[in-house]
Amino acid sequence: PHPTPTPPFSTRRFPPLQVRIHGSGETLLPVGRSLVANVQQTSDNGRVHNLGTSVPFEVKTLVTPSVLRNQYNWPESAKGKHGSSQAVAEFYGEFFSNHDLDSFFNEINEPQQSIAQANVKGNLANDQDHAGGEASLDVQYLMGMAPEVPTYFYSYSDLNPYTPENEGFLTWLVTMGGEQNPPLVHSLSYGDVEADVFNSTNGAAPYAARVDLEFAKLSARGMSIIVASGDDGSAGFLARNDPMSGCSHAAPEWPASSPYVTTVGATQLATDGSSTYEIVCSAREGGVITSGGGFSDIYSRPVWQKDAVQAYLKNGVGVPKASFFNASGRAYPDITALGSRFLVFVDGAQVELSGTSASTPVVAAMISLFNDARLGAGLPPMGHVAPFLYQTAVSHPNAFTDISEGSIACLSGSPETVTCCDDSFGATKGWDATSGLGSPKFDQLLKIALDTGKKQDLKQNFKHAAKLVQSRRSTQAEALEPHSA
């Protein structure tokens, strides 16, 4: 089966910040691999069906940085001042254009920032004449939401040597691990089918385990890896390849399912006529894509999310039948944010993009600004963010907006033709497998992140990451060396 790349979301533009290109090749999300579902299917068992028509109260306003700031109580004054840094990782030959960045900032009325000449490293130069949707989306919204935070562009042509249709994440991670001061926050909008990545018949599993080791090592150094949850609901690419049988069991995505990263889902705006609110992003409701989520078939549930996930399973609302998923696995997403109908400039044109590829750089930018504030207060960076989020949901539940409407039963596509599964996960009060802990309230989370009492909590997160490194090393005596395709 093909990997499940997370497609770019709504259009977006970023202010021209200091962008440096690293790696063996400039690439971004594989825009050439369409994630839009145009297939109508029915099954003799009723497992797959087309549900037609979109929700009558869909909000079609394009999402821009100002919309995001208003939605999440995110002040315009939040900018980089104290040494924070951030980056995007791109594969499959995605490029971005500085001209598009300029156009984006002009469109959103943001003051343009001076941009240093991009430092291109590797075997692929940034082909600005062929800017792609994924790269443009990632760079524009990471920079647009975290102004004046130095931003880096890591691009690679490498592929997984065992499953060459998948990304070569290891080269990227080892490159960062070898840097003295790598960026503190990394936004990753790519994903593959977990079962393919951990295929025991082709030797791929040790490669994935080595990638996890590098994730854990970076977390132990204070870095945050923010990953998109996917754009084809809970059944993912398996249902797209074989709708008749693909809906019989959830198809977790990786590295979204990894406990060593923080995973981001997507929401869309809806209205009841008097107010606008967020619901789970679903193609059936006009959201273009359906946010990914579910439970890993490989990883056991980490202790930091045990109580939240167990409450969801015990409640039973929005929980599919037991045979559909691994109820003891690592559950995702951890958090969510708007990911439908983003305004983006691509190759000189203003376009609209949707996906968890949009919500992920938004959350990554938020963490970059939290880091900047912490560094200014003499505190360490956030590191692995997921444990902090779950701790905060217990101590300060109002720091999140609970998303209690929607499901992830469908693939991506148009409301009239999208394929949907009968079994899936639904939204409910508290953590759920469609939207995690909910969407963030920037102002409240920032205050909590700056709370001096959290300094010790984050140190505990670092210690936890260090233990994970030791554990991974003990099981990976023959750790693979990075492979360049």
Q: Where are these predicted regions, by residue range?
A:
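Short glycine/serine- and small hydrophobic-enriched flexible loop segments
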Residues: 364-372
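Polar, glycine-rich mid-to-C-terminal structural blocks
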Residues: 259, 263-305
